[in-house]
Amino acid sequence: MPKRETKKIKPSQEVIKEGPFLVAIHLKGIYMSNYTNSPCAACKFLRRKCTSDCVFAPYFPPEEPTKFANVHRIFGASNVSKILHEVAPHQREDAVNSLAYEAEARLKDPVYGCVGAISVLQRQVLRLQRELEETNADLMRYAGCLGGETTSAYGGRRG
């Protein structure tokens, strides 16, 4: 447990330093110093104060600045804010993840975006289906070459 440092500022106020946090205890309640609370990636990017009711904070943590930068670059902060307000709270995380995926895909492929990735995957599925059909046909031909012969449980042929 980190060492706790306490010092009195005024008779009505006491400051406690515990780990990275600085807590001021007033007679009216407890207030945390804002310098230790990092703003969310969106507020940091937009250079504004991150409030407790920030719509971006739960979905754009300070550790992921490129996630918001990409989303902002493609969709714009105002549009993302509107989307988050229109979406039900339990669906917002999925909406943000979808926006982040689409933004990253659009930055990689400005013309097709995620549709280009979907197209590549569809072609890959078709190629693998054809390969599977060809392999099954080869297997049937091989089984047909054996004719009436069957194999025993021990791998030997019985005629």
Swiss-Prot record:
Q: Which Pfam families match?
A: LOB (PF03195)
Q: What is this protein called?
A: LOB domain-containing protein 25
Query: Lineage in the entry?
Result: Eukaryota, Viridiplantae, Streptophyta, Embryophyta, Tracheophyta
Family matches, as PANTHER family:
LOB DOMAIN-CONTAINING PROTEIN 25, LOB DOMAIN-CONTAINING PROTEIN 4-RELATED
Q: Which domain of life is it from?
A: Eukaryota
Disulfide links within the chain? none
Stored InterPro entries: LOB
Annotated tissue distribution: Expressed in young shoots, roots, stems, leaves and flowers.
The family classification in the record reads: Belongs to the LOB domain-containing protein family.
| Sequence ranges assigned to domain LOB in this UniProt record | 38-139
